[in-house]
Amino acid sequence: MKTLIRKFSRTAITVVLVILAFIAIFNAWVYYTESPWTRDARFSADVVAIAPDVSGLITQVNVHDNQLVKKGQVLFTIDQPRYQKALEEAQADVAYYQVLAQEKRQEAGRRNRLGVQAMSREEIDQANNVLQTVLHQLAKAQATRDLAKLDLERTVIRAPADGWVTNLNVYTGEFITRGSTAVALVKQNSFYVLAYMEETKLEGVRPGYRAEITPLGSNKVLKGTVDSVAAGVTNASSTSDDKGMATIDSNLEWVRLAQRVPVRIRLDNQQENIWPAGTTATVVVTGKQDRDESQDSFFRKMAHRLREFG
């Protein structure tokens, strides 16, 4: 009888342990698969594509690739002598038309004072018309001078903000055209994370929720806050024909891949450029508050580790 009881007890204990283990593993698996997290996340930053507003030879490059620069710092200079001469020519035109306008103003004033008693109305009108023409030419010359001055100022390319010069593509002696991108500037203190969450996990993502960011290849966990969720994404299976009618591609009904939606996460602390824009990370949205690691069970900790490997 005692032997039977011991066998039954061992069997019952084994069954209970198996059930408990199954429940624990099942909960860990559900937490791993359904909680709001993704390994498809990228560090991003505000990037300014710097292009000159004038064309010409590059006469001086003042920075090197990946250098941290301050707002207003000179990056490179374009052919100033040419634009200086253009400004001097425009200034000479302004001076000429100013003198000519003064002469025509005096002539028109003299004829208007003499009146029709001394000359015909046609001669008076002609003097007034010549004056107006010269004044218009003076205004045009002044506008040309102002543009020449602006072009000269813009031969010096300056940093529009504090940040890092990257992908520097200009060298002294090269000819650069107006509007062609010469360098990119990654703004300092503008880093954030874009986490591409599956649509099935968006229920647990809200603006203001806390998030943990683990850069790929690092054990350091950064903290952040969900800033916003994208309002829409492109439907790759839907296009329009030449009449504007929707064209929907056929999908396999038994295979439905979850669409990924960008979620923008604001970092609590800027990390400078330790993790450059474009590098990857794992993101876990923990809810309204940060996760208390001391309260995590063994299986939950295992689920967190699983996220790093798939």
From Swiss-Prot:
Per the database entry, which stretches of residues form a coiled coil?
none
What parts of the sequence cross the membrane? 12-32
Q: Subcellular location, in the record's words? A: Cell inner membrane
Gene Ontology molecular function terms on file: transmembrane transporter activity
| Domain of life of the native organism | Bacteria
Which Gene Ontology cellular component annotation is one that this UniProt entry carries?
Answer: plasma membrane
Q: Does the keyword NAD apply?
A: no
State the conditions that upregulate or repress this gene: Positively coregulated with aaeB and aaeX by AaeR.
Q: Which UniProt keywords apply?
A: Cell inner membrane, Cell membrane, Membrane, Transmembrane, Transmembrane helix, Transport
A Pfam short name: HlyD_D23
Membrane-topology descriptor = Single-pass membrane protein
InterPro entries this protein is in?
CusB-like_dom_1 (IPR043602), CusB_D23 (IPR032317), MFP_Efflux_Pump (IPR050393), PHBA_efflux_pump_AaeA (IPR022871), RND_pump_MFP (IPR006143)
Please give the function described in this protein's UniProt entry: Forms an efflux pump with AaeB.
The entry's family comment says: Belongs to the membrane fusion protein (MFP) (TC 8.A.1) family.
Q: What is this protein called?
A: p-hydroxybenzoic acid efflux pump subunit AaeA
Instruction: List the source organism.
Output: Escherichia coli O17:K52:H18 (strain UMN026 / ExPEC)
Task: Name the lineage.
Answer: Bacteria, Pseudomonadati, Pseudomonadota, Gammaproteobacteria, Enterobacterales
